[in-house]
Amino acid sequence: MLENVKKSFFRVLCLGALCLGGLMAEQDPKELVGLGAKSYKEKDFTQAKKYFEKACDLKENSGCFNLGVLYYQGQGVEKNLKKAASFYAKACDLNYSNGCHLLGNLYYSGQGVSQNTNKALQYYSKACDLKYAEGCASLGGIYHDGKVVTRDFKKAVEYFTKACDLNDGDGCTILGSLYDAGRGTPKDLKKALASYDKACDLKDSPGCFNAGNMYHHGEGATKNFKEALARYSKACELENGGGCFNLGAMQYNGEGVTRNEKQAIENFKKGCKLGAKGACDILKQLKIKV
């Protein structure tokens, strides 16, 4: 009898320890986010929401952000842009950079909140200050386009420089184009080429295409067909029609490479399919069907 009581008491202690351990685990916000991410990957969005809610209540910024994503996408909950904005705001207050950026997007487009360009700029600026490249690029784009603020190429250069420094490929390409044209900064072809090259390294196809053009024509560097071919080839691999067309043209004309009409035609075909009109035109001249 006494032995049975001891066993029962031991079981209660063990169960108590398990419960305590569970509570402790639930109180670890980062672990909660990890569990939420696991549930999300398994497409159990309802369970993911529960974990993210608990993490957010414990002021874990990524928990609030992920909760905002669920409401924005309508996963595990009814789609609610107002709630998405609310949770992005909480994440941003807790210095989660992408939360600031996406909140900026909502204010810029007026989704879930009243459209407010000044607030969009404020949140993009905070994202950029938190070293989120897309936040810097968004600011650069706004000042570059001049649709909702007075166009300011100097500020565009400032923010695209920050974006490029944070390895945003598109930001590097646009920065290169500003150096190329001398907008907001003195014209500097060497800096333009360096920016395009970095963009290409970051797998931005227009950056590869533009770098290829500069090497091909000797702008910002000594004319170098080998480097031009390499950039056009990478642009083509990244589905840039102009890159495929220019690569094909160099192969067809034997520039920097042994003439290879067969390979050139294949690249013209790919370029045409990707929307490069010049590639389509040359195929017509050669009487070759795409």
From Swiss-Prot:
It is an enzyme of class 3 (hydrolase). GO terms for biological process: response to antibiotic. It comes from the Bacteria. SMART domains: SEL1, TPR. Its EC number is 3.5.2.6. Keywords: Antibiotic resistance, Disulfide bond, Hydrolase, Repeat, Secreted, Signal, TPR repeat. Residues 1-25 form the signal peptide. It catalyses: a beta-lactam + H2O = a substituted beta-amino acid. GO terms for cellular component: extracellular region. TPR repeats lie at residues 29-62, 64-98, 100-133, 134-170, 172-205, 206-242, 244-278. Antibodies against HcpC are present in sera from human patients infected by Helicobacter pylori. May hydrolyze 6-aminopenicillinic acid and 7-aminocephalosporanic acid (ACA) derivatives. This is Putative beta-lactamase HcpC. It comes from Helicobacter pylori (strain ATCC 700392 / 26695). The gene is hcpC.
